[in-house]
Regions:
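Active-site-adjacent beta->alpha loops and helix N-cap segments on the catalytic face
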Residues: 75-85, 143, 147, 190-210, ...
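Short beta-strand/loop segments at the ligand-binding rim of alpha/beta enzyme cores
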Residues: 40-46, 93-98, 212-222, 263-278, ...
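Catalytic beta/alpha-barrel core
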Residues: 71-74, 100-101, 121-123, 160-162, ...
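Glycine-rich phosphate-binding active-site loops on the catalytic face of alpha/beta enzymes
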Residues: 64-79, 241-253, 292-310, 340-374
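Alpha/beta catalytic cores of nucleotide-metabolism and tRNA/nucleoside-modifying enzymes
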Residues: 1-22, 162, 222, 289, ...
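Terminal amphipathic helices with adjacent charged low-complexity linkers/tails
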Residues: 73-87, 124, 128-143, 174, ...
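Catalytic cores of alpha/beta
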Residues: 57-60, 231-239, 278-296, 336, ...
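Bateman/CBS regulatory modules and CBS-like beta-alpha motifs in cytosolic regions of diverse proteins
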Residues: 25-42, 48-50, 79-119, 124-126, ...
Length: 479
């Protein structure tokens, strides 16, 4: 047994010391950062891989805002892949492999495709895959005969463009012909791509969106540590997942190291995020195993009780600082996961060495989270829960089994999370705007124009509990 001599600190133990600054406006400050060495973000915020935080809608909103969402793993492989594909199909400049049907297919066929893929229009081709028409939801609106051939209901004489048509030319063609979809074809008239008005408008509305190399929204997905998870990884990567997050509470474990090594060997190009750890040694082990980024945080989350139940963890500021000290030398980003309650905490985490922060409860109350709405005493809330809570574990076992969980299994489980509710907060876009604005204010007080500068220039001062109370509104009635 030994006791470490240093006092471990968390965000409420410190403040950033204001410094002489030449920053004129916080709006000019850059919040660009990296999730992994190959994935750039415009804001350093990641939505947590929790089943009350991130599914399709949250992932889309996060990517559009310049961050990224990590779709949780507590669903079937097929459903998780479907969620990823929905994100990928939400917007893109060119749809490289557009959906198509043949002119000999039926109205029933196209309706099934539209329902399965959330697509509003399907290109129709002949037996040689040459474009001959297009069917949109408008064409199907009053069509009652599901057996009719698409050749009878499709819009013919479709306007097309060459495969190499750029965005400017495509926009001009769409405007000239007053159409919403522009199929791209090769010299033989065969379908090679698709450009839509909807996607062009989204490009302009979200200029800082996080995109992959093909112009699609970026998204991550979580997996477990069982060897069978390699199949899940394969399917997720095939669907276009940009980052694989290995998701267990105690990441500094043999199981985690082995699964990261296996993924790296099987899928060398995959971007792998390991976690969670709370020490420099744990961080280094995951880096040595092949992790491209490391998630730091054992027990700081608002719905996590690991430190109470297991007596294990490291206060989050110290955990981030010590982990970043080893990771930054190797160009590996740190994700500070948990304990973030305010924009000031985001600034402190980045100053301590984190490249991004992962948020759970702060985002669980938004429109885009999959949590259930509840009303209590006239106020609206959404459900939030730790993924190690009793109910989350019961639900997980029910999904993995035959839908039933034995009383013995329930009694044997020791919960390290709680089920809770958080106030309804409206759109995640507004929550992110407030957080990023506060972060930029913190940067200005430390004379930092970039997040890297914030880390380099930051000076922390410790404070007493009285200092913390002084930091909050006091001696007044807050309206």
């Amino acid at each position: 047994m030994k006791i470490l001599p240093e006092v471990a600190l968390t965000y409420d133990d410190v403040l950033l010391v204001p410094q002489h600054s030449d920053v004129i406006s916080r709006r000019v400050l850059s919040t660009r950062t990296k999730l992994t060495p190959k994935i750039d973000l415009h804001i350093p915020i990641v939505s947590a891989n929790m089943d009350t935080v991130t599914e399709y809608a949250m992932a889309v909103a996060m990517a559009r805002a310049g961050g990224i969402g990590i779709i949780h793993r507590f669903m079937s492989i097929e459903e998780q892949v479907r969620q990823v594909m929905r994100v990928k199909k939400t917007e893109t400049y060119v749809v490289d492999n557009p959906l198509f049907l043949h002119e000999t297919d039926t109205v029933r066929d196209v309706r099934q495709v539209v329902e399965d893929t959330f697509t509003g229009g399907i290109v129709i081709v002949d037996k040689d895959e040459r474009v001959v028409g297009i069917v949109t939801t408008r064409d199907l609106l009053f069509e009652k005969d599901g057996s009719r051939l698409l050749s009878e209901v499709m819009t013919k004489n479709v306007v097309t463009a060459p495969t190499d048509t750029d965005l400017v030319k495509a926009e001009a063609i769409l405007h000239k012909h007053r159409i919403e979809k522009l199929p791209l074809v090769d010299e033989n008239g065969r379908l090679t791509g698709l450009i839509t008005v909807k996607d062009i408008l989204k490009l302009k509305e979200y200029p800082n969106a996080t995109k992959d190399a093909r112009g699609r929204l970026a998204v991550g997905a979580a997996i477990g540590v069982k060897s069978t998870e390699l199949y899940r990884v394969e399917k997720l990567l095939d669907a276009g997942t940009d980052a694989i997050v290995v998701d267990i509470a105690h990441g500094d474990s043999t199981q985690e190291v082995e699964i990261i090594q296996a993924i790296r060997k099987e899928f060398p190009q995959a971007q792998i995020i390991g976690g969670n750890v709370a020490t420099a040694d744990g961080t280094q082990r995951l880096i040595d195993a092949g992790a491209d980024a490391v998630k730091v945080g054992v027990g700081p989350g608002s719905i996590c009780i690991t430190r109470i139940v297991a007596g294990s963890g490291v206060p989050q500021l110290t955990a981030v600082m010590q982990s970043a000290e080893v990771s930054r030398k190797q160009g590996i980003p740190i994700i500070a996961d948990g304990g973030i309650r305010t924009s000031g905490d985001v600034a402190k985490a980045v100053a301590a060495g984190a490249s991004t922060v992962m948020l759970g409860s702060l985002l669980a109350g938004t429109d885009e989270s999959p949590g259930i709405f509840i009303t209590r005493k006239g106020h609206r809330y959404k459900v939030s829960r730790g993924m190690a809570s009793l109910q989350a574990n019961v639900d997980r076992k029910a999904r993995e089994g035959d839908g039933e969980v034995s009383q013995e299994e329930v009694e044997d489980y020791v919960s390290e999370g709680v089920d809770a509710s958080v106030p309804y907060r409206g759109s995640v876009r507004e929550v992110l705007r407030q957080l990023v604005g506060g972060l930029q204010s913190g940067m200005s007080y430390s004379a930092a124009h970039t997040l890297e500068e914030l880390h380099e220039k930051a000076i922390f001062t410790r404070m007493t509990p009285v200092g913390l109370r002084e930091s909050h509104p006091h001696d007044v009635d807050v309206n």
